[in-house]
Amino acid sequence: MEEVIKILEQIKPGVDFNTEENLIKEEILDSFDIVTLVAKLNDEFDIEITPADLVPENFNSAEKIYELVTRLEEE
């Protein structure tokens, strides 16, 4: 989880990713941020986030992003 938060902080400094639960809904992360995030997550965790995974529910909080990464690592 800590690595996910570090990546998020690199992309969008100044956001409290430990408590924020509406990163997409409140437009804290925009589409460019998501593309950057996906690339960094794919590289850092050696996973492949597919277009099917690119739904707001998977990216609304650091916890949801971590759950996505964990699920993809197990596949």
Segment roles from a protein language model:
Residues 1-16, 67-75:
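Thiotemplate assembly-line natural product biosynthesis machinery
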Residues 31:
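Conserved G/P- and acidic residue-centered "switch" motifs that form tight phosphate/ATP-binding loops
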Residues 9-28, 47-55:
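Phosphopantetheine carrier-protein modules
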Residues 53-64:
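AMP-binding/adenylate-forming catalytic domain of the ANL superfamily
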Residues 38:
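Internal alpha/beta domain cores that form substrate/cofactor-binding pockets in large enzymes
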Residues 35:
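Conserved catalytic core of two-component sensor histidine kinases
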